[in-house]
Amino acid sequence: MRILFIFLSALPLVNTPITSDVINEGATIRFEHPLPAMNVDGRENGTYNNIELGIPGVLTTLDTNLGMMLKQLRDNVLEGRHVVFVDGRFIPVYKNWIRDHVHTMKAFRHWERDLRTYLDFTIEHQRPDGSFLELIKQMDDKHWSFVAEDDIVFFPEDNLYLARLDIESDVEYLVVEGATEYFKATADRRWLRKNLRKLEKAIEYSTTSPKRWDPEHGLVKRAYTIDTWDFSYEKSGHYDRRITEKTPMAIMHGDNSGVYQAMKQLAWMNRKLHRKAKARRWEQKAETLRENAIKYLWNGKYFKHQLPLGCPPADDKEDIRLSLSNTYDINRHFTTTGQSRSIVEEYMFRRDTTSAFAEWFTIDPRYWPKFGDSYAHPAYINGLITSFTAGELAKAAFSCGYEAYGWDILCRFYENMVKDGGNVYFLYDRYTRAPQNAKLGPAAWGAAALISAIDEGLAGIEDIDCRYRSLGFSPRWPVTPYKELRYCTGYELSADIVDVRYILTGAGMRYCIDSPAKDIQAHILLPEGAQVSKVLLNHRVIPFELTETGGSRYVDFSAGHLRGRTDIEILF
């Protein structure tokens, strides 16, 4: 013990790297600093115990800001995790609505060890027509009184019920999304074989049920609500969530992009089970749905809010009303690059012209003086600012050539988090920025969208197969001030981790990737004005393409037959 103490006391205290240089062997561009570290070149770049590092997480040589933002976002998501004891089951949930649970899965899929139980419970209670129930609530929560008897299953011993708010049309495609996330994280083909037909039946319900499908337009319909929310434009609509012959109906773009994504996911999962003909049929259905949506819902710049069916519009602004699902439409790959850019440009325009503190609207313009008999403006989903629009918009901007705008959104949102003690809220007042519905709303949903924007948008790491065996790699770090960093993501459940080192110098840029990937599809953003002389993969020159998205230039190439570490150098 005395010898160990003497040895440690003789070590230098700061700024002397104590690390192996194996990572730099054979490289043209060398990493300059070991990470993790607490102090680099006199700067505090890491916390004492590296509390900022998680999955996903980042360490930089500049500061702790982005790392702490991710940590606080993870904390906000974890705060929404609790358990439900129902029907002899112990079910971990991130909010006890399957909708919120799946939207939040964008984040917790990385660390949660039980991705399956709530999905299994929901799928097992699928109704004969293919539809799903959506929320587990206590008996003294009166949502059960808002719906018909056949939309409820009671569990009296647990003082709980399982219900479906009939006016919503998003539940089925969200369950498919959740199932896809589970399968990606596990590659559990046995589970997929058991459940794929049930998932298909759910989307068949969405596209055939008289409650959900409008055959005239060939599109999914819902009760006339604000975007994807659960109260309709009619008197008593706040407390009556049924669909009756008096319920006003409409077509909302977000339901259709959701079903489109579900169809593409069903095609992908069928291919994983070698069912190619069925996969092609789902892809054809998806393309027809997208064509119909563009024909009837696209206003030339973005998707209009609602297309009323057999009822008058709520006001004269539906064709110009920008609603939150436009950002989801982009991230579900429902739009072309040109359409995606047009939607993002509309948000950028409204940022410059709005009197609100940010452009992350639920809807804009809001309904005046209120929506039906609910929520006078601006209140709740009728016109407030929301965290999940911020996250989805940032992610969308990264993907369509507005990378600097995506980074700007993240920076502005982090400023809000700092002011709010690291907290993320569901809704914010348009003018004062004060949190709204702080205790009741799904704040974790917004935090998860922001994590996804950083993970898949900024860091550009996408699992395009299962367990990161095939890696989409589209990093966009040059739009940030960070010149050297380490980014980690993956699935703790399967112990599949992607660990990326990055450095940008005058000579070029380098990415060193430790991952399970056997192949990589690279689409790497270049710094503005950079001219590429060559690209090295594992120290060997490879062919590449230069592509453009908007004014942004990327290096594109594919690499296969990979094992372990992949080293990419782009020389200027």
PLM region descriptions:
Residues 94-222, 252-256, 260, 383-394, ...:
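Aromatic-rich carbohydrate-recognition surfaces in CAZymes
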Residues 360-378, 484-497:
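Generic long, charged, amphipathic alpha-helical segments
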Residues 392-572:
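Non-catalytic C-terminal accessory modules of carbohydrate-active enzymes
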Residues 20-64, 68-72, 76, 93-97, ...:
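Catalytic cores of carbohydrate-active enzymes
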Residues 9-13:
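Hydrophobic core
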Residues 23, 29, 86, 90, ...:
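The feature captures the catalytic groove of carbohydrate-active enzymes
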